[in-house]
């Protein structure tokens, strides 16, 4: 298990907490989620302290860049009045920032990638999906069920299409969680495997010492690629969240 590329995803119990038959132990996953939230809050606090700087520094520019990026994303993907967009912007901004920092912190050696665990991504996607569904019913009432039946469908095909649309709608949350988990886990595992291969060749010495340069270059390239994937997956999760929210609000 020591050489397994999956060892990096192991849940380690740090503080055991048992209340009867309930298990609330504080793990490395809990620690890094807490660190992520603390880092984001501290960054935003110091950047916005005293209203921020008239001439922004690097950190303030970084926070403003994320803010403008998410704001443009919301304006492009969610149609309707600006009050509707402002209502859901904080949720989308927090979701994107949390996922982005979780993914980036997972790139640091000896850290833990929170989003590489299916239970985390699935819990996040299902909670958001349930919230979006509630928004749909609050906005449209029972008319929200019309999202399951496209206009102009022949009556004999209606039951079949409603069933297909219902399955498709329910699988949105599942696919949202699987996509993030699978990409983060696969990328980190690949980097770990190639890193171990390059280190083995380096340790053997001799002519293999020169041969290990190619795997090392590949590892560096994959690390850069994985960094891009970490940012991209936070973006994909967020844009799909905006699309699903727009469907619930406008029945598109």
UniProtKB/Swiss-Prot annotation:
The source's domain of life comes to Eukaryota
Any idea which UniProt keywords this protein has? Answer: ATP synthesis, CF(0), Hydrogen ion transport, Ion transport, Membrane, Mitochondrion, Mitochondrion inner membrane, Transmembrane, Transmembrane helix, Transport
Family membership, please give it. Answer: Belongs to the ATPase A chain family.
Q: Name one GO molecular function term.
A: proton transmembrane transporter activity
TM annotation in the entry: 6-26, 31-51, 88-108, 117-137, 144-164, 190-212, 225-245
The identity of this protein, by name, is ATP synthase subunit a
Q: Which Pfam families match?
A: ATP-synt_A (PF00119)
Instruction: Sum up the protein's function in the record's words.
Output: Mitochondrial membrane ATP synthase (F(1)F(0) ATP synthase or Complex V) produces ATP from ADP in the presence of a proton gradient across the membrane which is generated by electron transport complexes of the respiratory chain. F-type ATPases consist of two structural domains, F(1) - containing the extramembraneous catalytic core and F(0) - containing the membrane proton channel, linked together by a central stalk and a peripheral stalk. During catalysis, ATP synthesis in the catalytic domain of F(1) is coupled via a rotary mechanism of the central stalk subunits to proton translocation.
Q: How does it assemble?
A: F-type ATPases have 2 components, CF(1) - the catalytic core - and CF(0) - the membrane proton channel. CF(1) has five subunits: alpha(3), beta(3), gamma(1), delta(1), epsilon(1). CF(0) has three main subunits: a, b and c.
Q: What is its main location?
A: mitochondrion
**Single GO BP term:** proton motive force-driven ATP synthesis
Q: Quote the SUPFAM superfamilies the UniProt record gives.
A: F1F0 ATP synthase subunit A
Q: Which GO terms describe its cellular component?
A: mitochondrial inner membrane; proton-transporting ATP synthase complex
What is its subcellular localisation? Mitochondrion inner membrane
| KW DNA repair (keyword) present | no
Give the organism, scientific name: Marchantia polymorpha (Common liverwort)
Query: What Gene3D superfamilies does its record include?
Result: ATP synthase, F0 complex, subunit A
The protein's topology relative to the membrane is: Multi-pass membrane protein
NCBIfam families recorded for this chain?
A: ATP_synt_6_or_A (TIGR01131), PRK05815.2-4 (NF004482)
